[in-house]
Amino acid sequence: MKKTRQEKERMVEELTEKLSQAESAVLVDYRGLDVAQMNELRRQLGDSNVDFKVVKNTLTSIAAENAGIDEINQYLEGPVGIAFGYDDPVVPAKILNDFSKENEELEFKAAILGESVVGEEKVKNLAKLPSREELLGKVAGTFQAPIAGFAGACQGIIRKFVYAVDAVRQEKEDAS
């Protein structure tokens, strides 16, 4: 069924908004994936707050121009799916990379990070980076280790002090 001009304009507006708000947008060629694989991909992305859209390339091109990301047009050939990540720029690339290991038909095309466009190789490198949560966990662990060590040392000192006071008390009781 053919879409009306109003529907297309609404889709362009929605896509422009997504491109503007997303931390990252990863473009993939999904040719060769069957319906079950596409549904599984959408489910995995959705579980991590990542939207996945398949929109006509001409509408995507117009939305990219509206969002000030004209460089993406060179990657809009063939069937293109776009994964929009809002919380962490690494998450869409990681999920798509993991999915492509099991489904070789899925191929990276490019990614939009902020207002810059990067090619396939940089997207694959992005997928290898730790996520924001992993980095925060490492930072917290780095801060926690010295604090835990300090707390352990303080407990040791207090324990020794208590033993010393108890020994003095014991001596006084024995002397009386």
Curated annotation (Swiss-Prot):
PROSITE patterns: RIBOSOMAL_L10. The keyword Membrane does not apply. SUPFAM superfamilies: Ribosomal protein L10-like. GO terms for cellular component: large ribosomal subunit. The keyword Ribonucleoprotein applies. Pfam families: Ribosomal_L10 (PF00466). It comes from the Bacteria. GO terms for molecular function: large ribosomal subunit rRNA binding; structural constituent of ribosome. InterPro entries: Ribosomal_uL10 (IPR001790), Ribosomal_uL10-like_sf (IPR043141), Ribosomal_uL10_bac (IPR022973), Ribosomal_uL10_bac_type (IPR047865), Ribosomal_uL10_CS_bac (IPR002363). Keywords: Ribonucleoprotein, Ribosomal protein, RNA-binding, rRNA-binding. Disulfide bonds: none annotated. One of its GO terms (biological process) is translation. Belongs to the universal ribosomal protein uL10 family. Part of the ribosomal stalk of the 50S ribosomal subunit. The N-terminus interacts with L11 and the large rRNA to form the base of the stalk. The C-terminus forms an elongated spine to which L12 dimers bind in a sequential fashion forming a multimeric L10(L12)X complex. Forms part of the ribosomal stalk, playing a central role in the interaction of the ribosome with GTP-bound translation factors. PANTHER family: 39S RIBOSOMAL PROTEIN L10, MITOCHONDRIAL. This is Large ribosomal subunit protein uL10. It comes from Natranaerobius thermophilus (strain ATCC BAA-1301 / DSM 18059 / JW/NM-WN-LF).
